[in-house]
Amino acid sequence: MNEKAKLPMLEPSDSEESRVFVKKAFEMSEKFNTPVLLKMVTRVAHSQSIVDTEERVEPDRVPYVKDTAKVMMTLNSRNAHIRVEERTKALIEYAESTELNRVEMGEDTSVGIITDSTSYQYAREVLGDKVSIFYQCLSSLLNPYMSIS
């Protein structure tokens, strides 16, 4: 979650995840009615890896609906802020339960690493399956490693 903009942000660790996350970003955007950021770092953008392809799916054409409530003018800002806060709560719940974030248990479960993006690949390359890794692709809240109650 991008704390300042209160937008969800996906951080892929390789080319295949980039492809999957673009599709996931569109799904999340439709579900939560919000833009979704895809954070690309130079290492991933310049990398090459095997990518699985899927059958192309043509999206349904949705007619344009003029919605002035989405135009940020003083008149709309108070209601928009309420909607953003409600959406943020829903996104936090989603981030804490999504299959995008995963724990990979290693041989030594007394040691764990919290990673995202390319640091996941670095940790796997150096440590292999020796330690447990919490791989966080979609973070939640201001402190992305803590759950709220």
Protein language model features and the residues they cover:
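Flexible, low-complexity linker and terminal segments
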Residues: 12-149
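Flexible glycine/proline-rich, aromatic-decorated loop/lid segments
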Residues: 1-4
